[in-house]
């Protein structure tokens, strides 16, 4: 919710994936913003009664959700690339952008549930299909 209803938060370690998502989101006026994906949030999801918990409490909720997912994705090999390259991934936080508080965001989106960031993701997939 830190970004309100204007931007979807994107957490990724991959600069190239971030660039692709940002470009697609700008083309569709379905904006996203890169957020910090840092291990500094790891203590918030580490507890005595479990290795990890899927929520770190109210502070930095999107950041702790992203660092939780990183624990399961980070280090996975992308076998399509040969060698040992890690899978590129992004966590997109839509808590704020999934619902518009007013009709002022853009011309095609009314107040209420928005379906965001579907337009950006479809454009991202379309561009990815043409480059593969």
Question: What are the residue ranges of the model-derived segments?
Answer:
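A generic structural signal for tightly packed, nonpolar segments enriched in small/aliphatic residues
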Residues: 1-132
